[in-house]
């Protein structure tokens, strides 16, 4: 079960989330609905660790997610999947993953290899398609 209590997230002086609370029960579908700028994406990014909460609680399977790295949250079973399908169509799946890892890694050779292995561990389907051109992936596969 995912439980969010009194969640506050701010961007400078702008309070994007102001005391949001809800519970998403296991086996149930929960939706987040709101107008543009209402904070839906901020909520999802905060739950997945991509934004820091100023205050409040987020628990998943009775464990706190507050302050955890996004990678740790993904390993626990929660991932933020952006709406876009941004891939470089002319490159292979493996080359796209390598390009994506360049933006977050410091020690190029070993860290890139590790990043690719982590992605394949999370998404074995991409490992099967590693040599395939990324432009031939389905929409869902591109979001992996």
Regions found by a protein language model. Name each.
Residues 48:
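Helix-to-loop junction immediately C-terminal to a conserved catalytic motif
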Residues 56-65, 76, 110-116:
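Conserved ABC transporter NBD signature motif
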Residues 12, 30, 68, 93-114, ...:
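ABC-type ATPase nucleotide-binding domains, specifically the catalytic core motifs of the NBD
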Residues 133-137:
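Conserved ABC ATPase signature
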Residues 33-35:
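The feature captures the beta-strand-to-loop junction immediately N-terminal to the Walker
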Residues 30-31, 80:
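Short beta-strand immediately N-terminal to the Walker A/P-loop
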């Amino acid at each position: 079960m995912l439980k969010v209590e009194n969640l506050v997230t701010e961007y400078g002086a702008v309070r994007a989330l102001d005391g949001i609370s809800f519970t998403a029960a296991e086996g149930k579908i929960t939706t987040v609905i709101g107008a543009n700028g209402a904070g839906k994406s901020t909520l999802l990014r905060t739950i997945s660790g991509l934004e820091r909460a100023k205050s409040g609680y987020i628990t998943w399977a009775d464990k706190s997610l507050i302050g955890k790295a996004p990678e740790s949250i993904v390993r626990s079973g929660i991932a933020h999947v952006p709406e876009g399908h941004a891939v470089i169509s002319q490159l292979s799946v493996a080359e796209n993953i390598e390009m994506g890892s360049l933006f977050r890694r410091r020690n190029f050779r070993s860290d890139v290899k590790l990043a690719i292995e982590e992605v394949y561990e999370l998404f074995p389907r991409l490992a099967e398609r590693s040599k395939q051109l990324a432009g031939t992936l389905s929409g869902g596969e591109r979001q992996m």
